[in-house]
Amino acid sequence: MKNLFIGVDFSKEKVDVAIIFADGLAETASRVFNEFKTTVSGYKQLIKWVEQNSSGIEPSLWLFCGENTGDYSKGLCNFLYGKGYDMWLENAKSIKDASGLRRLKSDRAAASMIAEYAMRNYDKAIMYEPLSESLAQLRELFLYRQMVVRHRCSFQVRRGEKRLTMEKSPIKTMISQSGRHIVSELNKEIEKIDKRIAELIKSDEELIEVYTIVTSVPGIGTQNAVCMMVYTDNFRRFNYDSRKIACYYGIAPFGKDSGTSVHSDPRVHYMANRQIKAMLTQAALAAVNFNPVIARYYMRLVERGKKKQVVLNNVKNKLIHLITAMVRNRQLFSPEYKISA
């Protein structure tokens, strides 16, 4: 049981901190607040301040909690992890939904709300663990590649539109040549990133092992494999639970059932990581064409009269369940696999 709950509200240049002293769900003292810079010296001052205001409570009874804000939250979380403190990084929407109606909006109020959330839900806390250095680097390369690809697509579309809509002129020629040059340079950048990704995977035993297993499935290419690895911490983030991974991808169907009038068939929820969901869709389409196990499963469902979009979502689910089981058991894909419909 924890007795000291430290809520942290992250921002670019500072963190706002609130401390709640509690015995169970009862607060035993007034809340205290402060703010610190997002630097190593600022983090050290934060720890010193908490120690001074801890009323003698042992560090093992402390629980830091904050919203997952990506890079903004990474610095302090890694610092606390390195010092041996318990840090809970929670989804921002979970905190907001559980905290009810709040009229006051400020950094200090947000830190207080987070500390209160930690106090009331500490039994559900999942302690923060950073990605391994190799996996963290792989994640950065993957995200950078996605950004470059988006820019390339933007220039390709813009150049195509101008070619179709503008009359022939020196300006049109300049735009076309410039766009072609930029797209060419971006293609070179993507090639360099892909080469670096391949080198990084080969340099790490665990990465190459998981990568080899995932890409042994026909239809799963390099980008989908890397995407799964970096977003699931090599499938450990969800403890190899394929249902949770499917939910994270936004392909797990949920129904609505209430009273006598609300009854709807299960549907996928809009809350999902849409970027990786789109990538999995491409993998599912490729698997239907090139993976005999998935192709047979797809045709069975289509012959039963199911809509093709529903069947495609089922294929995505089967791929996630299949790949997760393979990684958990450290087994390569076999064409002898049998999938029940």
Residue ranges, per PLM feature:
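Short, glycine/acidic-enriched loop or turn micro-motifs at the edges of active sites
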Residues: 12, 70, 94
